[in-house]
Regions:
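Bacterial N-terminal signal peptides that target proteins for export
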Residues: 3-16
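Bacterial N-terminal signal peptides
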Residues: 15-23
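Signature of exported/secreted
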Residues: 27-297
Length: 297
């Protein structure tokens, strides 16, 4: 009888030990990212998963006109949802983007002005993106959501300006730790109704592996610089904006899932706004931009 009880205890002990070994093996079998291993990076989560993001965009402008400071800060707070749609293209994704919420305001020495965003909250539009993010397009440009802030506060703002931050261009070939790739693209800068064109040259470097919000990510650090050019005729005068911009970003790409989890960008620019006409003017201008984007549940 004693031998039988001892035998049962031994069987239980062995079973527990085997269970522990299985658990340890299972936990250890989840392959972690290796900084020295090559990974092929592609945007692909949108095929099977909705992704929601919170983005905060801040733009500070410092300028002086006829001896009077005209400083302003514009703040945009977004929540938007990416949903995959059926696409005939194997190398691109068709996404529906829903603007779930947006708060927009401008702060000056005279106080704070909030912009009416009710007409675009909850609205959607489509976007096509290539697997590497090198091409972004809009099948129905007339669907794009615009926020009219008035000529002096920033003009009509097309919301595609924030989306590029979600899709930095990925390298065509697999990358491993320390490797660099480059990207060139255009976007508009917010400054009154001028909204000058920014021609950006960016350099991306894979610098580390890191877990962010539960995802195993490649950490990428980027630097970029740009020439800024814009012109417009207003009130019988021709206005031009010429300047330079430089900035840096940190972004985290979930390799297995195929999407950017988090982005943080800082930029500074300097330029000159000139006008022609009976009373020509030359106004120096400086701007600081910060962008923070992260996925939310």
């Amino acid at each position: 009888m004693k031998k039988e009880k001892t035998h049962k205890r031994d069987l239980i002990a062995v079973s527990v030990l085997v269970g522990i070994i299985v658990m340890i093996t299972a936990c250890g079998s989840s392959e972690k990212l290796d900084f020295n291993k090559e990974y092929k990076l592609e945007y692909r989560s949108y095929k099977y998963k909705d992704l929601k993001y919170k983005a905060v965009y801040k733009l500070k402008t410092f300028m002086e006109m006829q001896g009077q400071p005209m400083n302003a800060e514009r703040v945009f707070d977004f929540i938007y949802l990416f949903s995959g749609k059926e696409s005939k293209s194997e190398n691109s994704h068709l996404l529906s983007i829903t603007l779930e919420n947006i708060d927009a305001k401008m702060i000056t020495s005279l106080g704070q002005q909030k912009f009416d965003t009710r007409h675009i909250k909850g609205k959607s539009f489509d976007m096509m993106i290539s697997a590497t993010g090198s091409k972004l397009s809009y099948p129905r440009p007339d669907q794009l959501l615009c926020l009219d802030m008035g000529a002096m506060a920033g003009g009509e703002l097309n919301l595609e300006f924030i989306l590029k931050y979600n899709f930095p261009e990925l390298p065509d070939s697999p990358v491993k730790g320390g490797e660099i790739w480059q990207e060139t693209f255009q976007r508009t800068q917010i400054e009154g109704s001028l909204q000058p064109l920014v021609n950006i040259n960016a350099v991306h470097q894979y610098v580390d592996v890191e877990k962010v919000d539960g995802y195993d990510c490649l950490k990428v650090e980027s630097t970029h610089e740009a020439e800024i050019e814009g012109s417009e005729e207003q009130m019988g005068m021709n206005w031009t904006y010429v300047g330079k911009l430089e900035g840096s970003s940190k972004w985290y790409f979930a390799v297995k899932e195929g999407f950017v989890v988090k982005v943080s960008t800082k930029e500074k620019s300097k330029g000159i706004i000139k006008s022609t006409g009976d009373n020509p003017m030359e106004v120096p201008i400086q701007q600081e931009i910060s962008v923070d984007i992260i996925t939310i549940k």
